[in-house]
């Protein structure tokens, strides 16, 4: 991060601040001396994620759903609120759409009123099942608008449109990042994402569930690297994005499963199930723009990131064994 640009202390709003990425972003902002307001409705966020922050005098927690307006005085808005794993956003697709559209509208309205800079956390899902590889920001994507994932994919695309329209028409200082697969501490064990699934299954001796033949690819970014680029993007003047934020190292799902099994010493077997509808076959970011405009590229490779993530889940399982299905 351009630390010198962020020395002036600010009031920072983080929507979805009790979630996986949001909680770690709040922690980093507090460490830099900022006043942080964490907004979360606790649909997927957890109090456990922010428990260590509650005694900090610069931290304020507000239980609130951003589909309803809120009036606050802030300098910066990180808009992260939205369920981000298929198991959660498909559970309530209409709510997911409302969060992306009404929630983003409300945060843009707030940013306009108080003249705050706002950064929207979009997603690689705006590219759908891409025909271009790796994906660059000028690729418009290949999204099924009526599929079971569309509440998230199209919701995020609509939110990007709102961000750009408010910038063009209302002069709101808005920014967009497109987050690719991210993992690390504070992930939920039950969120259905591939890294958390594989680690929990391996640590508990369950079969490792691979959907499809395992040859589909993903790129995995460790969460500390993501928080770094979010902070850089927020403080970068005269650049609104969108910009890809992810690790360009590409792995097959089968390679990930084998790596997790080896690193945990698990005796779990690999089992294969049908690939879900609209599940992308390839996903890898081109981060040339992030390198050029933000001077950023990820530092943590997959092995090093897993070495930090596996102990988190070991500790979580030691205290939450009843919540894990056998």
Descriptions of predicted regions:
Residues 1-6, 25, 64, 106, ...:
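C-terminal substrate-binding subdomain of Rossmann-fold SDR/epimerase-dehydratase oxidoreductases
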Residues 1-182, 224, 300, 308, ...:
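N-terminal Rossmann-like NAD(P)+-binding domain of SDR-like oxidoreductases, especially those catalyzing
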Residues 91-92, 186-191:
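Short, solvent-exposed loop/turn segments at secondary-structure boundaries
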Residues 97, 187-188, 219-222:
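Nucleotide-sugar-dependent glycosyltransferase donor-binding/catalytic pocket residues
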Residues 133, 189-197:
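A glycine/serine/threonine-rich, flexible loop-to-helix segment
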Residues 151, 159, 191, 253, ...:
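Conserved donor sugar-nucleotide recognition element shared by glycan-biosynthetic enzymes
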Residues 158, 162, 166, 198, ...:
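Hydrophobic alpha-helix immediately C-terminal to the catalytic Tyr-X-X-X-Lys motif of short-chain
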């Amino acid at each position: 991060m351009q630390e010198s640009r962020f020395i002036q202390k600010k009031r920072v709003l983080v929507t979805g601040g009790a979630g996986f990425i949001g909680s770690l972003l709040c922690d980093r902002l507090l460490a830099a001396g900022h006043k942080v307001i964490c907004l979360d409705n606790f649909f997927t966020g957890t109090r456990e994620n922010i428990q260590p922050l509650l005694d900090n005098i610069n931290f304020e927690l507000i239980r609130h759903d951003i589909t309803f307006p809120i009036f606050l005085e802030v300098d910066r808005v990180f808009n992260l609120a939205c369920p981000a794993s298929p198991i959660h956003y498909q559970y309530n697709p209409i709510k997911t759409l409302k969060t992306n559209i009404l929630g983003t509208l409300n945060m843009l309205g707030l940013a306009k009123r108080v003249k705050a800079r706002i950064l929207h956390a979009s997603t690689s899902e705006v590219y759908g099942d891409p025909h271009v590889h790796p994906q660059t920001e000028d690729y418009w994507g290949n999204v099924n608008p009526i599929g079971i994932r569309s509440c998230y994919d199209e919701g995020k695309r609509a939110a990007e449109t709102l961000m750009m329209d408010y910038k063009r028409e209302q002069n709101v200082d808005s920014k967009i990042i497109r987050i690719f697969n991210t993992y690390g501490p504070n992930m939920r064990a039950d969120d259905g994402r591939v890294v958390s699934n594989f680690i929990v299954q391996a640590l508990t001796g369950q079969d490792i569930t691979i959907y499809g033949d395992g040859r589909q690819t993903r790129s995995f970014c460790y969460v500390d690297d993501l928080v770094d680029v979010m902070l850089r993007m927020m403080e970068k003047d005269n650049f609104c994005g969108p910009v890809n934020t992810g690790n360009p190292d590409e792995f097959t799902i089968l390679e990930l499963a084998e790596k997790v099994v080896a690193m945990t010493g698990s005796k779990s077997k690999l089992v294969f199930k049908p690939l879900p509808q609209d599940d992308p076959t390839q996903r890898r970011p081109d981060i040339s723009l992030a390198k050029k405009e933000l001077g950023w590229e990820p530092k943590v490779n997959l092995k090093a990131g897993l070495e930090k993530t596996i102990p988190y889940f070991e500790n979580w399982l030691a205290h939450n064994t009843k919540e894990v299905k056998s």
